[in-house]
Amino acid sequence: MWASGRTARALRCGTTSRCSRRNIYVLYGTNALISQSDEAFLKYYSDLLDKLRERFAGVPIYVQSITPTTAEQGVKQPPLENGHIRLINNAIAKLAVSKGLYYLDAQEALADADGNLRGDYVGTYDGIHMNPTGYAAWADYILTHTVYSDYNKQFVTEGPYA
């Protein structure tokens, strides 16, 4: 399910009931980090994960890290500075593990040696969104870092699972 431009509240109120329930992938945070305190953000995230677990009991839930931004974006908006994002991602990982969910650290695939969004993945003026190459790297990371399922074969064109 892709929910670009929708709020987590909108997702919580109905969109999820119409989606496939083989797996659920959650990414919440980039916009919310700007508008909420860290404590409010983590409380909301915890509640959201609890609701998903309750509503979709038995369905694997993959909680994704917040993706890195450019160094320039972190200067413009301190909540999106990559050191801060790493701290929040650590808290998100702890939340996921404490609730028995999977955690995917996309930073491994998207960040450069300094922890910033790789330059060849930057796609827009905002330093947050990626270009098609970046999104492809992200999708590849997800496909290669989730629990194996024959269902995934339709998305894999190379490698040992193709």
PLM segments and residue spans:
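Conserved SGNH/GDSL esterase-like catalytic core that processes O-acyl groups on lipids
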Residues: M1-D47
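Short, flexible, glycine/charge-rich loop motifs used to bind or transfer phosphoryl groups or to couple energy/partner
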Residues: C13-T16, L52, R118
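Structural recognition of the beta-strand scaffold that forms the well-ordered cores
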Residues: N23-Y28, A32, P60-S65, Y102-D105, ...
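Short hydrophobic alpha-helical module
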Residues: L27, L52-R55, G83, L95
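Internal catalytic-core helix/loop-beta-alpha segment
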Residues: L49-G58, Y62-P68
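Catalytic His-Asp segment of secreted/periplasmic serine-dependent ester chemistry enzymes
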Residues: P68-A162
